[in-house]
Amino acid sequence: GLVEVMGGSIEVTTEIGDRVKYDVINLIPPQRAGAIAVQADLVGADKRWCEVNHVTYESVKQKGIHVIGDATIGLPVPKSGTMANSMGKISASAVVHLLGGKEPPQMPPVNVCYSWVSNREAIAVINAYRIAQGKVVMIEQKLTSQNVAVAQNSEGWARSIWNDILG
């Protein structure tokens, strides 16, 4: 990691003492769950992420609080909007079941991510999961070929997920 950024001298210093000059640099801060997760004492021993039950997304530290999306750790899933959307639906179903005194169904998440690779073509990464012994397990990952049809599918997918999330 970086310990110092010297903007005027176009140089950074790393934690091991290396001084690196740059023309253009993209700095990404250390990733972690948001401040609200820290304040609610949901963050685990690593002080960065929230451990959750893989079936309900209930915090392992604070019963009755469910955590979804990028704040979670321990699941073999990408940190993507599609995954957070899937986790949200599964968690909502689990909450309804738990409030009704019923066992939540074991519903694996779903994930599809599209990436444009030219001005006309895209690829898709599709992940399939199952629940095994109370844990989310990836059973298949497929990468589509680069083509125009995938790009067209990505546009429909984007409209659908935006409508689902934003209404």
Regions found by a protein language model. Give the residues of each.
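Glycine-rich beta-alpha junction loops
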Residues: L2, V24-R32, V117-E121
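A conserved short coil-to-beta-strand element within the FAD-binding core of flavoproteins
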Residues: G1-I10
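Internal hydrophobic alpha-helix adjacent to the cofactor/substrate pocket in enzyme cavities
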Residues: A84-P109, S115, W162
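Glycine-centered tight beta-turn/hairpin loop motif at sheet-sheet or coil-to-beta transitions
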Residues: E15-G17
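C-terminal auxiliary extensions adjacent to catalytic cores
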Residues: A124-G167
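Central beta-strand plus flanking loop segment that forms part of the substrate or channel wall
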Residues: A35-A37, N111-W116
